[in-house]
Amino acid sequence: MGDRRTISLPESDKILQYCSEIRMSPTSLLPSPSHSVANNLSGSVYTFCTEDNLEQCITYIDQELRTIGFPTVQAVSKNGEGRKLHLVSIINCIYELLQRNSQTMRSNEEVETQLLKINGDLEYLQSIHQRQKDQLEATKRENCALQERDRQMQCKNRNLLQLLKNEKEEVQKLQNIIASRSTQYNHSVKRKEREYNKLKERLYQLVMDKRDKKISIDVLNYVGRADGKRSSWRTGKTDAKNEEEMYKVLLNDYEQRQKQLMVENVELKKVLQQMKKEMISIVSQRKTKEKLEDSTGTVTSDIEEEIADSSKENLSELSCEAVREQLISSIRQQWRILKSHMEKLDNQACLVNVPTPDENGLIARAEHEQELDKLISEIQQCKETIRSQQQLLKQQLSVPRDDDTSKLLQDCYLLEDKERLQEEWKLFNAQKKNFEKERRNFTEAAIRLGHEKKVFEEDRAAWLKHQFLNMTVFSDHKNLEERKVPGVHFSSEQDNCRLHSRPHDKVLASSGDYSRRPSKALPITSSSKHSLTQIESISWRDSSISPNDTDFLN
């Protein structure tokens, strides 16, 4: 009975189980304190005190009570017979013990109720903790969704910026094309205006000449002058005067022609500068340089060089109009080639495999991870191949070789390059032969054209002489000239056919149609070159002046 009853609270890791056990046993189901005390007393009576050890039990209880602070339960008898039980002390001790027991029971009940409250608060806090944990997970998911949405919006923004940049480039290209076409249009309008003014002046001259004409005898097959007047008799003074007038007219024509050419050159330079700027802008934007490794690329470059050389040679022998047209056509051709090349590069860039996004514009995570794994595996394979190549190279360098084996290996390494160079040399020689052949054909055609022009000039001089003799009153001289030169008669139909055939021959010569071989090839000497230059100058002058002394180039 002297042992104190202490309450040991459970540990923190077993508090849930302890609380659940307490919740499952409410206060109504717990045994009452009176029942528990009665049971304990009934058990202790039979176990603690017996008739044999009564004195010892009394002594032990007395000692325990005194240690607790109670008064002794034994008192000395008055008779001196010894010590005996003091009932008043016993009753007081029992009462005090009962009071203490009731206090401890009340304190236990209070502790139990407080423990129940603490358990309820703990459950509430646990529910709040679980709720906060769920809210944290939900906020994390929302944050991930917002981050993914932000990334998608950034990707979409980048795509829109790229599209805007492409549209701006397209607009710039279209503006450049419009500007170049406007310059070409202005150039053509100015040329048409000049032609219109010349035709207007010519019409005015013809109308005024018709008004100034008097009634006279018309001569058939008459080659008129530029002013529409009849030519005077040929004397020394008239010849000198006519020569001076001819030189003045030629100088005026040359000056006008030079001015026109200068204006056209300025406009063409502007067009060329604009085209150059466009090409530089396109090339600088793309920054793509492709290496032509196969032989087809060298063949195309050689063909382009041959075309450029032939165009240069043709430019030196053609008139200004033909040179201008050929230059413009070559520039347009180069522009088309560059444009087609850039379109081809764009198509090749568009054909690159891109992972297809889903309906929301997102790439599946599994596909993304597969692509990453594939790239990582490819990187590992590349590293392994590089490592193996390094090891093989070290082994090859470490193995000693003699001079013969090293030379043999070098020859093996260079064999493929030698074969490729030999094939390129063969192709180059074949192209060179073709170029020499075309050059020879061109030279022969130029010589033949010069001879034909010379024959034509002789025929023309004879025809003019014949017409001049027909205009004179000396019929006897006419008959005499007919007997001396029987093959000089030309009808008007033959004259028209010959005059109409001249521009056709000129077009054939300027277009480069030299496939027809001449009947007889003549060697080129210094005198023949000089005669060719004279013939070309005469033919250019005659091409700009018609038989009626009119300028039909404009």
Curated annotation (Swiss-Prot):
Compartment(s): Cell junction, Adherens junction; Cytoplasm, Cytoskeleton, Microtubule organizing center, Centrosome, Centriolar satellite
Entry-linked InterPro entries: Adhesion_Centrosome_assoc, Afadin/alpha-actinin-bd
Keywords: Cell adhesion, Cell junction, Coiled coil, Cytoplasm, Cytoskeleton, Microtubule
Gene Ontology cellular component list: adherens junction; centriolar satellite; ciliary basal body; cytoplasm; microtubule
TM annotation in the entry: none
Entry coiled-coil feature ranges: 122-287, 359-449
GO molecular function terms noted in the UniProt entry: microtubule minus-end binding
GO biological process, one term: centrosome cycle
Keyword Hydrolase: no
Main localization of the protein described in the UniProt heading: other
Stretches the record annotates as Disordered: 508-528
Family, as annotated: Belongs to the ADIP family.
Record function comment: Belongs to an adhesion system, which plays a role in the organization of homotypic, interneuronal and heterotypic cell-cell adherens junctions (AJs). Involved in cell movement. Acts as a centrosome maturation factor, probably by maintaining the integrity of the pericentriolar material and proper microtubule nucleation at mitotic spindle poles. The function seems to implicate at least in part WRAP73; the SSX2IP:WRAP73 complex is proposed to act as regulator of spindle anchoring at the mitotic centrosome.
Assembly notes: Interacts with WRAP73.
The protein's name: Afadin- and alpha-actinin-binding protein A
